[in-house]
Design a protein with these regions (language model features):
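Terminal low-complexity tails and localization/encapsulation signals of metabolic enzymes
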Residues: 1-36, 69, 73
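Glycine-rich loop-to-alpha-helix module at the N-terminal edge of alpha/beta enzyme cores
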Residues: 32-104
Length: 104
């Protein structure tokens, strides 16, 4: 299999962020490197929690209908990209295609 295209940075507070540290994601079937991804620090984790808390302040007052529409759109995107997600799962975990599709 060829390398799957996927973001390799952290997504915190609505922004893609690179980190000074990274690690390799390895295909367990042949130990080939699939990607090199950003390695989050403790501070990155704290920043993500803060960003999520801040976003909740807005999300919690967003009308239910609008929240439902956003979640529905997220579902539609995830469904449309199910094969891409399954491919990443199969590559990273060495899962059979059927099992990987079952997780999407």
């Amino acid at each position: 299999m060829t390398e799957a295209a996927a973001p390799t940075s952290l997504f915190i507070g609505g922004q893609w962020l690179s980190t000074p540290a990274s690690f390799e994601v390895v295909d367990p079937s042949d130990y080939g490197v699939l990607a090199e991804v950003s390695d989050a620090s403790v501070q990155d984790g704290l920043d993500a929690v803060t960003a999520a808390h801040d976003a909740f302040q807005t999300w919690s007052v967003t009308p239910a209908r609008q929240r439902a529409e956003i979640l529905r759109r997220a579902y539609e995107i995830m469904t449309a990209e199910a094969e891409v997600c399954a491919r990443l799962i199969a590559l990273e975990n060495g899962k059979a295609w059927r099992d990987a599709m079952g997780e999407t």
